[in-house]
């Protein structure tokens, strides 16, 4: 069995190639590596936290509740890596935190949260529709894109309503969502 401390040293070496090479070995250790990786998510060094999340993202033993707090990490790169990790571990328990993360000041993190919600799929639809009611435009765009990708008929009313928005981006995602639902017809205002 590889020495855990040596693998963690390589993971946090500051050398991306070396760090990436040890991830399969860490995963080969199974659940034995999890406590050390979780401890690493609390490091003062952003790079260490990022690599811990990167490793946890590919572990089949990662528990969603251990990732959720990392969506509030002070470093946007760690938050983005966490949203990506949650996309690899789709779970309904992450829906509220991911919807909140769609408001992240970092647009990549917000977009990755939307991608994770797409992976969760239909269980996220009701909360996404509710979010459309009062969210700022940037969040509504992400929500509409997410709804368009999920392709759930419950989103039809919000997609139709968004066709009348002034934002061309909202109109685009509304039209795309309707087309993906097989409702690709011309909509004319009376």
Regions found by a protein language model. Give the residues of each.
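Structural detector for internal amphipathic alpha-helices that build alpha-solenoid repeat scaffolds
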Residues: 1, 9, 16-31, 39, ...
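Phosphate- and divalent-cation-binding pockets in alpha/beta enzyme and binding domains
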Residues: 158
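Acidic/negatively charged segments and metal-coordination signatures
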Residues: 189
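TPR/TPR-like (Sel1-like) alpha-helical repeat modules
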Residues: 163-168
């Amino acid at each position: 069995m590889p020495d855990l401390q040596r693998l963690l040293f390589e993971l946090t070496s500051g050398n991306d190639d070396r760090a990436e090479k040890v991830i399969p070995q860490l995963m080969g250790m199974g659940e034995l590596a999890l406590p050390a990786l979780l401890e690493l998510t609390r490091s003062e060094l952003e790079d260490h936290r990022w690599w811990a999340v990167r490793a946890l993202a590919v572990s089949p033993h990662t528990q969603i509740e251990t990732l959720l707090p990392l969506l509030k990490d002070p470093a946007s790169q760690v938050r983005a890596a966490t949203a990506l990790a949650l996309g690899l571990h789709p779970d309904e328990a992450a829906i509220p935190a991911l919807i909140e993360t769609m408001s992240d000041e970092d647009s990549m993190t917000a977009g990755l949260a939307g991608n994770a919600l797409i992976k969760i799929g239909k269980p996220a639809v009701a909360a996404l529709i509710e979010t459309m009611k009062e969210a700022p435009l940037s969040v509504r765009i992400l929500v509409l894109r997410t709804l368009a990708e999920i392709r759930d008929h419950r989103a039809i009313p919000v997609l139709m309503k968004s066709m009348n928005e002034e934002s061309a981006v909202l109109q685009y995602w509304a039209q795309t969502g309707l087309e993906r639902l097989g409702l690709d017809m011309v909509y004319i205002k009376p």
